[in-house]
Amino acid sequence: MSYQVHITSTAEHDIMRAADYIEFTLKNPNAADNLLDAATEQIGSLADLPQKFCLVDDPVLASWGIRFVIINNYLAFYTIDEEKQSIIIVRFL
């Protein structure tokens, strides 16, 4: 069963800031596009198997069910709501 994937406005802002930094500060628009493509692909893949990535090492965050996926040089942090069959992307750092 597929889960719904939701991205918080904070995480969305994080993703756009990272892409803007790569495109405008590092002057590499291709790398920025690659980051956005990789983020879309990896985050979308969570819908089919959300538990495939581990909990964070921090015991407090792990107790909240915070997991992470590595996307290029960034981490996307997310939680799983089993009751609502949804995944919430909370940050992208």
Annotated model-derived regions:
Residues 41-52, 75, 83-86:
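Short, charged/polar surface micro-motifs in flexible loops or helix N-caps
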Residues 43-69:
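A short, surface-exposed loop/turn module that caps and links secondary-structure elements
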Residues 34, 54-57, 87:
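Short, hydrophobic secondary-structure boundary micro-motifs
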Residues 26, 71-93:
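Enriched for short, Lys/Arg-rich terminal
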Residues 1-38:
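Arg/Lys-rich, positively charged N-terminal/basic patches that mediate binding to nucleic acids
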Residues 4, 68, 77:
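Short aromatic/hydrophobic contact patches that present stacked aromatics
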Residues 8-10, 49, 90-92:
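Generic beta-structure capping elements
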